[in-house]
Design a protein with these regions (language model features):
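ASCE P-loop NTPase motor core, strongest for the SF2 helicase catalytic module
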Residues: 53-279, 283-466
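Charged, low-complexity intrinsically disordered regions
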Residues: 1-68, 249
């Protein structure tokens, strides 16, 4: 029986098979390449989908391995070291087992649990196991604001773990940073990692990034410098693996498992097609799922004894002065919008949103004045009502603001309400001062309030007293 074939199509298929064989090293395809082929084989082999339609299916071993990583409760159990001084919750033990399994397989891993589920304690448990059983050296990079919290957690949960802080806040004024040889864990900041060239000269066994969204932009000097630091295993800790765009995800995976999502050009081309191709999202999700462990506080299967978060929206009206400025700004914008277009028009809208926020905070912030009379702002008057109740109960309150210039006026206002001064924390607060504030605010002495800028106070603070 004869079957008619398309000669050009057969030729394309054979060429595709040859390209797959070329990917194999030592007669075996790497696990990373096998998973990349599943995500976007046409892009990886540089073959148009119009030219040849190729599908990829997993063998049983790869399928089982991926399913196991996606469901960490099924992983082989590894004992926690006796030198680790904490009792992990069940889901935290799963996270610990998952990190261990990823290290055995040689993969980078993203621990992306919701804020408050204990990413730090899981990581310390894993690092303590590595210190005792395999040794080596680990480098932890984090925002400067988190140094104090990590120090306290290490000394509490793994007191035998030798570590060194590689940061100017840990030195006397005349000292320079010297990397000591007899440590297991070295802790530095994103800013210092950019300056400490010697970090690239050490072959680290573990490279961990806390608040790893700091490398979401692949084009920055900071991101490029961190990706150049050599390490056998890379770990990212973040509650927000994707903040705004899918390119955030590519940069994260370029750090964790370089090449898994292709080049930035390949990934960009892939994501452009997702709008019209729902299957593409499913492929991408399946591709990254084994490398990201994310649990949410709202999932009762994860943590059942955590009370539900209670949100109460307090609505307020603008003062007469705020209303007048608001209307005035609207008229100004209307006039300018008719005269602008394109990127200039977009820029005008964005800058106007910021001005509206300032007016809603207090007219004096928008006008650049320093008086800040409470009666001129509906928000200030609403805040007074809330804080007077807190004062009567002798409780404590955290006030967050997007604007650093609002922290001092808010503190002055709260000082008047509570008849007692609280704390102000913003980007200019030193690491040492920040740690002292956190310790004192959580202590027995009554500190009624803390005003925090969002950027400086949005991550890494354990303020349980409020």
């Amino acid at each position: 029986k004869w079957v008619e074939i398309n000669k050009d199509r057969i030729k394309a298929i054979l060429q595709a098979l040859d390209k797959v064989k070329d990917l194999a090293k030592d007669e075996a395809l790497s696990l990373g390449d096998a998973m990349r082929l599943e995500l976007n084989i046409n892009e990886m082999l540089n073959i148009s989908s119009d030219e040849i339609d190729i599908s990829v299916s997993n063998g049983q071993w790869l399928k089982t391995m991926k399913e196991t990583l996606i469901n960490p409760t099924a992983l082989q159990k590894v004992d926690i070291e006796p030198s680790f001084n904490a009792t992990l919750r069940l889901y935290q033990k799963d996270g610990y087992q998952w990190l261990y399994q990823m290290s055995k397989l040689g993969f980078g891993a993203c621990l992306a649990d919701d804020m408050g589920l204990g990413k730090t304690v899981q990581m310390i448990a894993f690092l303590e196991y590595c210190r005792v059983n395999t040794g080596g050296q680990a480098l932890l990079i984090l925002p400067a604001s988190l140094i104090g919290n990590w120090q306290k957690e290490i000394e509490r949960f793994a007191p035998e773990m030798p570590y060194q802080i590689l940061h100017k806040s840990d030195l006397k004024s005349s000292e320079t940073i010297q990397i000591k040889e007899n440590r297991f864990l070295y802790i530095t900041t994103y800013g210092m990692a950019l300056r400490l060239e010697e970090l690239k000269d050490i072959k680290w066994d573990y490279l961990i990034l806390d608040e790893a969204q700091a490398i979401k932009n692949p084009g920055t000097k900071q991101t490029k410098a961190i990706k150049q630091i050599p390490a056998k295993m890379r770990i990212a800790m973040t509650g927000t693996p994707i903040e705004n765009r899918l390119s955030d995800l590519w940069s994260l995976f370029d750090f964790l498992n370089q090449g898994l999502l292709g080049t930035t050009k390949e990934f960009t081309n892939f994501t452009k097609e997702l709008t019209n191709n729902a299957v593409g999202y499913s492929k991408l999700r399946k591709m990254i799922q084994p490398f990201i462990l994310r649990r949410l506080k709202t999932d009762k299967k994860i943590i059942s004894d955590l009370p539900d978060k209670l949100e109460m929206n307090a609505y307020t009206t603008l003062s007469k002065k705020q209303i007048a400025l608001y209307k005035q700004l609207i008229e100004q914008i209307k006039e300018k919008l008719t005269e602008s277009e394109g990127i200039e028009r977009k820029g005008l809208i964005l800058s106007s949103i910021m001005k509206f926020k300032q007016i809603c905070n207090h007219p004096d912030q928008y006008l650049g004045r320093e008086e800040y009379k409470p009666e001129h702002s509906g928000k200030f008057e609403q805040l007074r009502e809330i804080c007077e109740t807190i004062r009567e109960k002798r409780e404590r309150v955290l006030i967050f603001t997007q604007f650093r210039e609002m922290t001092e006026p808010l503190s002055d206002f709260l000082k008047e309400i509570f008849s007692k001064e609280g704390f102000v924390l913003h980007g200019g607060t030193t690491v040492k001062k920040r740690n002292e504030m956190v310790k004192e605010f959580n202590g027995e002495r009554y500190i009624p309030y803390m005003v925090l800028s969002l950027k400086a106070g949005g991550v890494g603070l354990n303020l349980t007293a409020a």
